[in-house]
Amino acid sequence: MKKFGLALAAVAAFTGSAVAADMGPRGYSKAPAPMAAVASWTGLWISGGFGFGMMEYNTSVTSVAGTTVFDPGHDTGGKGWLGKVGAGYDYQFIGNFVIGAFADAQFSNIRGQNSFTCPGICLGPTQGYTGQIKNDWSWSVGGRIGYVALPGLLTYFNGGYTQANLKQVDYVFASNGTAVGLSMPSRRMGGYFLGGGTEYAISQIPGLFWKNEVRFSDFGNRTDTQGCGAFGICGVAAAAHSLDRNHLYEQAATTELVYRFNWGGAPVSTKY
């Protein structure tokens, strides 16, 4: 019996050694691939840039009662440079489509000379007057919809509400530049805008984009009271000498740098 037990122990030892030899060294499993970031247009952004704008100012002037026409109507053109800042939020959905909301402000030097000839019934003898129409700032709020045409390239259309500020106009005689005494106070005009553009990723700097946009703005109609001062040919101060009915349009082209705070999106595994 003792010999039988020793024989079993020897067989077990031999069998274990053989099995261990057959198994060989333990295999090595490669670590899973790192999570890769997928570009996403969803998130907050800020922007800043500059551009060039042109305006058209349509105006006509009558007496306060509207019974006398001082100026039947004419157009004034203007142009100038502008600076622009903005911020917004975009959301990418259904693959390559993007929607967003934004607000921006423009600080500009878009101006033109509003010159016209007023008949004798206006202010003394028939003669020419001129005054500078200047849009010195404006702001806009709106939305946009776009399509990611290529990796890192967004094309879009936008629209919304906009408001512009026109500085006070002080008219002078066109012949010698001396004050007429006729003026129109600073005022604001509001309307809508429509535009479109592109955003392109600057690959060397993650999150930085180059945006180019064109925009048309219609600031609507407005009627303003022109006052007269106690100088020039007015002679007597009058808060309401005449009515100026006007309409302002503007077209602008801008180029900006945009920074997106979460460009790259959330990490997504490349192995399933």
Predicted regions and their residues:
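Gram-negative outer-membrane beta-barrel domains
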Residues: 2-272
